Amino acid sequence: MISLLKFSACGIDISDKSIKYASLAKKGCQLVLDKYGEHSLPDGVINGGVIFGQDVLIGVLKKIKDEVNLDYVAVSLPEEKSYIVEMLMPKNISWQEYREAVELHLEERVPIEISKASFDYEEGGISKIAGFNLITSVVETELANQYYRSLTDAGLLPLVFELESQALARAIIKRGSRDISMIVDIGREQSNFSITVGEVVHLASSVNIGGNTLAKAIQDDLQVSLEEARKLKEEIGLLRKDKGQNPFGSIVRVATVLRDEIFQRLSFWNNSSLGVAKRDPITRVLLCGGNASIPGLAEYLTSDIGLFVDSANPWINILSFDDQIPTMTKRESLKYCTALGLALRVSGNKND
């Protein structure tokens, strides 16, 4: 069925607050951005990744179907309701033995009964001495079925579901890379952290710190409207100003918490190798999401963390800027990383 999408592919990124989509089309031998858009969701339709307002969600998905004029899609599942488990496996065992090992140990690692879980696995890094890491992604089957029913009731056929972190890695990690990276996806209400070896996600987690946390801190400190606080966050950020309202102190206070969360994950990765093959250290941090382009944030984190921190490039596996310039701005493209990674999954390009 994936061959049906050889000339057009759409990724749909569903979160608590909005649905973003991006479709890619073939132009000769190249991929080009075809359509993209975002629809806000009313409060309570999705909460913590769980669907509570299915009828409203279906209505929004129907609008998206009309806009992209496609039936087949790739769709993200919520990071806060999904798990990635890393296990060290001995060499030279069959895939059936892999599955049995996963089933045996899964309930020890995630709070889902094995009979109620859907999971997939892929090979991670290899140790010549110990074996290799098996990376298993897990989600509750009923949650996946909720999303499937909503999509099909809207007339969309999901070819594949995958975790947000996996779609992000496909979008922003250069194909064939073996770099070890931390991806920080800064959304409105939360930030998602993932650690990748090449394009494979080994660890993923979330914290309730996002763009709205920053905006509310500015609003409280400077006594401005939330709209003005968001404007200050996006236009001035961590750049110091001699005159006028300066959100530096407000943003630093929240950015320090974000920095500490990054430090915790760096420390865990670099110092914990129990049950997994020996790890090489993380070499860089990539920022994405709707709040990744706050002026001065990457530079602040670089100076404190001691690693190179930069905005991600979601076009790295799609197009060359020498050949074409996408119609999205850089700020917009950072919001659509997950949707673009999903579209790549079913684009017909050899990414998987």
Regions found by a protein language model. Give the residues of each.
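Glycine-rich phosphate-binding loops at beta-strand->alpha-helix junctions
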Residues: 277-310, 314-316
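Short glycine-rich phosphate-binding loop at a beta-alpha junction
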Residues: 61, 69-80, 151, 156-160, ...
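Non-catalytic, solvent-exposed interaction/assembly segments
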Residues: 1-105, 145-147
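Gly/Thr-rich phosphate-binding beta-strand-loop-beta motif of the actin/hexokinase/Hsp70
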Residues: 2-39, 71-78, 172-213, 218, ...
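Active-site neighborhood for divalent-cation/phosphate handling
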Residues: 76-173, 284, 316-317, 335-338
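Glycine-rich phosphate-binding loop plus the immediately following alpha-helix
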Residues: 46, 142-167, 200-242
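Adenine-nucleotide phosphate-binding core of ATP-dependent small-molecule kinases
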Residues: 220, 231-281
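Glycine-rich phosphate-binding/hydrolytic loop that grips phosphoryl groups
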Residues: 292, 310-352
